[in-house]
């Protein structure tokens, strides 16, 4: 009986490694070093920590496992999982632990093989986007238009138009709408 317990615990550890190894969120965190220079070691530590969590707590519920995984991801990788995949990972771990406890080694080994085939090759690519000169100028114009307000009795918009020169002054007068808003039209180039 003790040999079977050790064997099922080793099998569950292997199953945990397969589940976490096929989880894209953890793979992205490791590949991009979200956990620092020791990201791979932290992922391996998670396997042992989850194995220990299951063996030291009887009758874990899926939400408890999910909370534990979320805590590990947040603490070790500074990652908050928002895609809902942690629920699937927790469910798989609970099912595999139950199967290991009941001695269903063939089913667990089949799941491990399935997860090994399904392992994702996920790499997040970071692209730097530099706006062109035209885009920078147009965004500056938009900011200028947003900075000034034209309220009745206020001369700040008129003084701003005069300070910018006649070429930048709007040709049409701003028209107040029925609901009290003022429509500001963008100048054309």
UniProtKB/Swiss-Prot annotation:
One GO term under biological process is: maturation of SSU-rRNA from tricistronic rRNA transcript (SSU-rRNA, 5.8S rRNA, LSU-rRNA)
Spell out the Acidic residues composition-biased ranges. Answer: 131-147
- Signal peptide from the UniProt entry: none
- Region Disordered: which residues? 126-189
A Pfam family found in this protein is WGG
- Which InterPro entries does the UniProt record give? Pre-rRNA_process_TSR2 (IPR019398)
Name the domain of life this protein comes from.
Eukaryota
Transmembrane segment boundaries: none
Which keywords does this chain's UniProt record carry? rRNA processing
List all Low complexity biased stretches: 152-169
Record keyword rRNA processing present: yes
Which Gene Ontology cellular component terms are annotated?
nucleus
As for family, the record states:
Belongs to the TSR2 family.
Q: What is this protein's function per UniProt?
A: May be involved in 20S pre-rRNA processing.
Q: Any idea what this protein is called?
A: Pre-rRNA-processing protein TSR2 homolog
Taxonomic lineage from the root: Eukaryota, Metazoa, Chordata, Craniata, Vertebrata
- Gene of origin? tsr2
């Amino acid at each position: 009986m003790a040999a079977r317990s050790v064997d099922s615990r080793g099998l569950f550890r292997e199953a945990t490694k397969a589940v976490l190894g096929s989880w894209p969120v953890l793979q992205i965190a490791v590949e991009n070093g979200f956990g620092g220079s020791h990201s791979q070691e932290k992922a391996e530590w998670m396997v042992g920590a989850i194995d220990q969590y299951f063996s030291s707590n009887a009758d874990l519920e899926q939400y408890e496992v999910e909370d534990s995984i979320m805590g590990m991801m947040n603490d070790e990788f500074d990652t908050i999982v928002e895609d809902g995949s942690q629920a699937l990972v927790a469910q798989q771990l609970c099912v595999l632990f139950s199967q290991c406890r009941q001695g269903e080694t063939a089913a667990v080994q089949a799941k491990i093989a399935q997860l090994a085939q399904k392992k994702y090759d996920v790499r997040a690519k970071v692209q730097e986007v530099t706006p062109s000169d035209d885009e920078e100028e147009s965004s500056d114009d938009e900011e200028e238009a947003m900075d000034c307000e034209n309220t009745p009795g206020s001369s700040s918009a008129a003084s701003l138009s005069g300070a910018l020169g006649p070429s930048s002054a709007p040709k049409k007068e701003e028209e107040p709408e029925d609901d009290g808003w003022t429509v500001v039209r963008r100048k054309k180039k």
